[in-house]
Amino acid sequence: TLLCTKLFFNEVNAVDKYEYKSKTERMLELMESGAYSRAAAIADEIDWRRVRNAVMLSNVSEIYEKTGEYQKGYDILTLAYQRAEGSRKIISRLCGLALKTGNVDEAIDFYDEFMQIAPKDPNQYILRYKILRAQRAPIEQQIEALEEYKKSEYIEEWAYELAKLYQEAGMTSECLEECDDLILWFSEGQYVYKAMELKMQYKPLTPSQQEKYDKRYARTSEETEEIPDIFSYAEADESEQEEEENGLPGAELMAA
């Protein structure tokens, strides 16, 4: 009887693993193609508490975040956090999702933890800015956070955000200077065109800027964004996951 019971559970586990593999492969395919709602529908069918792979859990959390299901995304990412304690990537995302679910105090806790783990990581300033924004802190403090980030990293999204903050604060000359810097450094792309439109609220574009702006639709229609290889990412070498995410070794699907 004991042998029969063991064989039965082995068969059940084999079916579970097959269904899990089949569903997650399809889910990641849909995620890769941008069909997040359909990917989320598959994710709803899986008991993620039994999954130990922190990378897979992070992907699922991102799917829910893309569909606006922030609480689900937060809950799944909390599981990833438990599987990979000390991961700055997961802690950073948890901070952002905590804000999206209205939990500012939790976001501050994750920010403090991020600072302990990675005190020199410039992304601390982005987290700080998001928290200050959620708290409706004085605009000067928000500007200071993004100015500090700019000293270490210059990313289109946050450069444009800084330009908008300058506009909000009535700092028109700083706003225009930031727009010109963004346009000069990155030349094209959605944030460059947004910066051009922001600048045009106050003064005309230069001839070269205007030429780029006039050709923006033709250029963007020709561009094809490279899609990340989610499958390779999800099947990352275990040792690399241990190093970067402090993931747990062993089978991805936990025993029931």
Task: List the model feature ranges, each with a label.
Residues Q141-T206:
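Compact, basic/aliphatic-enriched, mixed alpha/beta core segments that act as assembly/interaction modules
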Residues E25, N59, R93, L127, ...:
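"A position-specific structural signal for the A-helix of alpha-solenoid helical repeats
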Residues K21-W48, M56-K66:
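Alpha-helical segment of the N-proximal tetratricopeptide repeat
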